C-alpha cells in the first residue's frame, strides 16, 4: 500500500477539495468547500493498492487508521473509494469498513463515496478529514455576507 499526502496547507486543501469531480460534476458544493476548508485542521491522504488482495488492502487501511494519532474535537470525514469499473463494495466489505473505520472517529460524521466510473486495475482510497476543536450546534450568520457573526 502506497500512502500519499495530498494537501499540506489550507490553500492546497481548499483547492484540492474544490477540484474533486466525478464525471465532470463537483463532489462538494461551494458551501461545503468553505465549511471544510475553514475548520481548525484538515487532512487529505490517498492510499493505493499495490500487490495486496482487496481484503488485504482494506485490512491495511484499517490498520493504518488505527495507528495514526486520533484528533480530539469534532471531525467530518469523507472516504472516496475508487473501485474498478461497475464494481461496488460487497455487503461484507461495507460491514468491515463500518466496523473498523467508523470506530476510529468515535461519534463523528462520515461519508463513503463508491466511485466506479473509470477503468482501474487497483483500488484507491482518498480520505478527507476536517477537524474542529469545538463544535457549535448553532452558528449565527450575517445574511448580507454569510459570515459567522461570532467571529467578527
Segments (PLM) and residue ranges:
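Tubulin/FtsZ superfamily GTPase core signature
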Residues: 1-152
Amino acid at each position: 500500500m502506497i500512502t500519499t499526502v495530498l494537501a499540506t496547507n489550507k490553500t492546497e486543501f481548499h483547492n484540492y477539495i474544490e477540484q474533486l469531480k466525478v464525471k465532470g460534476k463537483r463532489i462538494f458544493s461551494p458551501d461545503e468547500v468553505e465549511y471544510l476548508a475553514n475548520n481548525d485542521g484538515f487532512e487529505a491522504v490517498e492510499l493505493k493498492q499495490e500487490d495486496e488482495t482487496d481484503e488485504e488492502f482494506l485490512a491495511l487501511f484499517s490498520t493504518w487508521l488505527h495507528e495514526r494519532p486520533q484528533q480530539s474535537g469534532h471531525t467530518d470525514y469523507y472516504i472516496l473509494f475508487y473501485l474498478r469499473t461497475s464494481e461496488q463494495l460487497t455487503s461484507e466489505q461495507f460491514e468491515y469498513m463500518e466496523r473498523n473505520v467508523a470506530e476510529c472517529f468515535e461519534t463523528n460524521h462520515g461519508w463513503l463515496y463508491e466511485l466506479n466510473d473509470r477503468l482501474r486495475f487497483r483500488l484507491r482510497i482518498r480520505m478527507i478529514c476536517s477537524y474542529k476543536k469545538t463544535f457549535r450546534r448553532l452558528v449565527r450568520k450575517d445574511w448580507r455576507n454569510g459570515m459567522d457573526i461570532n467571529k467578527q
